[in-house]
Amino acid sequence: MPRVLQILQHALFITSTALLERIRRKYSHLVFCFFKPCDRIIPKKEGKVMDTCVIFCAGEFDRLIQPIRRTDLVIAADGGLRHLTQLGIQPDIILGDFDSLGYTPEGAQVYPVEKDDTDSMLALRHGLRRGCTRFVLYGSLDGPRLDHTIANLQSLLFLAEHGAEGFLAGNRYIATVIKDSSVSFPDTATGILSVFCINGTADGVRLSGLKYPLENGQLSSCFPLGVSNHFTGQAATVSVKNGSLLLLYDRCNGLVQKEADHADL
């Protein structure tokens, strides 16, 4: 008789566990709404130092600017999972409210549709908590939602304020923000470079090696003085002593490297 009881108890345990798992899967979106596990600091993968975070958003995507490295943290933000699927790349994290994708992928971190952060911003916060300092966002600059494009441009300033650098990689252009720092372009750079003040005023602005140079100038967010500058076949530099600048340039020039913070420019 004790043996029969043991068998019954074991069967009951298995049944209960399976039932709980089914409930967890079916109502996982409610659990994530309240507990939001991505607010926790997620440990880095064993032997994988992640300084670059590559995020795929739901906007239009053409091709990669550079290969994704094994050490990159790859995040699919909602509909950005489609792009990764086409590339045959398995993301480290899948998150969002999935109103764009239309279904909830297995293992995804689910958020409510009504929230303060966009799915892209959720991904950025993830990357920052993982210690990433460089962010590349695909599907973030081209698409039918102008409001999301503007939100993504603002997120570049958010990254700069948190000591990180970010790039929106579009099908034709790349956007990035520098704060109290400088960037340089090689003499092979071509096309247009537009420079905007993204927050109030920017002082001590220097544009060199461009068709329209500027020395110790001031740019304001209420007047687009820096629009449509041009590379000239010389090495070019954009720097700002105090403030934040949004740079928009041709995609063929690749990702630039921020050079200095609070430097004596």
Can you say where each PLM-predicted feature lies in the sequence?
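Long, charged alpha-helical interface segments
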Residues: 173, 178-265
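Short, positively charged and aromatic/hydrophobic N-terminal segments
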Residues: 22, 38-41, 46
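Short, acidic/small-residue loops that bind anionic groups at enzyme active sites
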Residues: 158-174
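Short phosphate-binding loop-to-helix
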Residues: 109-130
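Aromatic (phenylalanine/tyrosine) cluster motif
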Residues: 13, 27, 32-35
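N-terminal beta-strand-loop-alpha-helix module at the start
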Residues: 50-104
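Short Gly/Thr/Asp-enriched flexible loops that form oxyanion-binding sites at enzyme active sites
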Residues: 146-157
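N-terminal amphipathic/hydrophobic targeting modules at extreme N-termini
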Residues: 1-11, 32
